[in-house]
Amino acid sequence: MELMINSHPDLEGVLTRRTAAKLKVLSKGYYVKGTSQMNNAALVCAVTDALKEPDRLSELLLVVDPQTYTLFRRASESPDPIKVKDPGSEQYRLLDDFCYLVCADTPDGLVVSVPTQIRAAFEQLKNDGFLKQKDRFDLLHNYAMAAIHLYGAI
């Protein structure tokens, strides 16, 4: 869990608190080249650049479950960190592991926030029509699941 200094942390600040091993795992997941020769500062810059790509965020948000997407969207659009209703759930953990969300323990419970650079990437996606694309993708997914359940019952 990260300490929340302000309502929306800086992505580089979040990444600098990660270990070199975790940064290397993230960089491999984001297809960053030449990480074996990079020091921590270079890894932070490379992973930050990879995370700021709107297409990468779009790919992830299209395939996450509806509850996780709703949590991300609420946290992204909220001016303040939002409280996680069920801290035992897995909704926030995937996005926290990928550094798209920042979690913090507060006296009121677990809160999540979206780093400013990720918020900017999500805003760009929304301006480019991502919300309509997400709605169509979810509709197709629901039709496919309904067909699977229908044919499974026959």
Report residues per predicted region:
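Type-3 copper protein
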Residues: 1-154
